[in-house]
Amino acid sequence: MLTKRIIPCLDVTLDRAGGCVVKGVEFVDLKEAGDPVELAKRYNEEGADELVFLDITASAQGRKTMIDVIERTADEVFIPLTIGGGINSIDAIRQILRAGADKVSVNTSAVKNPDFIKESSDIFGAQCIVTAIDCRRNTDIKNNPDKTILELEDGTPAWYEVVIYGGREATGIDAVQWARKAEELGSGEILLTSMDRDGTCAGYDLPITKKLSEELDIPIIASGGVGNPQHIYEGFSIGKADAALAASIFHFREYSIKEVKEYLRDREIPVRL
């Protein structure tokens, strides 16, 4: 049985002159306050299976700094590194992979131009291309007969709508149908974030996680809402996810990766310890 992966996620902003800041992180025991490379090293030592950096930088200068961060991280950390955030060209993917990243995550750019997934996958291989899907529950099923209707925890029927630009823009696209298409186009993994759950510490959105895990042949990474190890356990046991992404519970040292993995192992979830 394949082991389940635990993946810390860092939101990285690089607009500050001469430095970089990890958003929402208590800068404890870091040699350089806010340096994502130091945090990546810590997670590597704690037993993370992979890392995700989401670049929330706007400026071109920040993009160049991100390449520097990737290079420094790749020198220090020997687990797979995925980079996401504003990636919209083959050249950008090439630069990021050359700098030492193992995968890139594409989101809004793929929704706007689905062939970008195919082109990227054809050039770099499916194993390098993660399609990130941000979605939100939509209970208007009367006007959406063509959507994939799921039953929520309280029995309410709903479909899941793809949102882009960090959740600011609804698309009218069904998340299940879009995930299927992304797989067909050559995506190697799906990073699924429920915008309803993100930041709530109320647990993953299990209905959509389970649906995608059952429907698709490629791995599903669950994201959005982790507040404790039980939520990660449910993401695997109920949501059937292949990997669990979390941020604040690790950043704020509420739980170590080792503690989470031991919790999972004790409940017969296969993990690498």
UniProtKB/Swiss-Prot annotation:
Record pathway: Amino-acid biosynthesis; L-histidine biosynthesis; L-histidine from 5-phospho-alpha-D-ribose 1-diphosphate: step 5/9
EC numbers: 4.3.2.10
InterPro entries in UniProt: Aldolase_TIM, His_biosynth, HisF, IGPS_HisA/HisF, RibuloseP-bd_barrel
CDD domains (alphabetical): HisF
Annotated keywords: Amino-acid biosynthesis, Cytoplasm, Histidine biosynthesis, Lyase
Listed GO MF terms: imidazoleglycerol-phosphate synthase activity; lyase activity
Lineage of producing organism: Archaea, Methanobacteriati, Methanobacteriota, Stenosarchaea group, Methanomicrobia
Compartments reported by the entry: Cytoplasm
Protein name, entry field: Imidazole glycerol phosphate synthase subunit HisF
Reaction it catalyzes: 5-[(5-phospho-1-deoxy-D-ribulos-1-ylimino)methylamino]-1-(5-phospho-beta-D-ribosyl)imidazole-4-carboxamide + L-glutamine = D-erythro-1-(imidazol-4-yl)glycerol 3-phosphate + 5-amino-1-(5-phospho-beta-D-ribosyl)imidazole-4-carboxamide + L-glutamate + H(+)
Active site: D11, D134
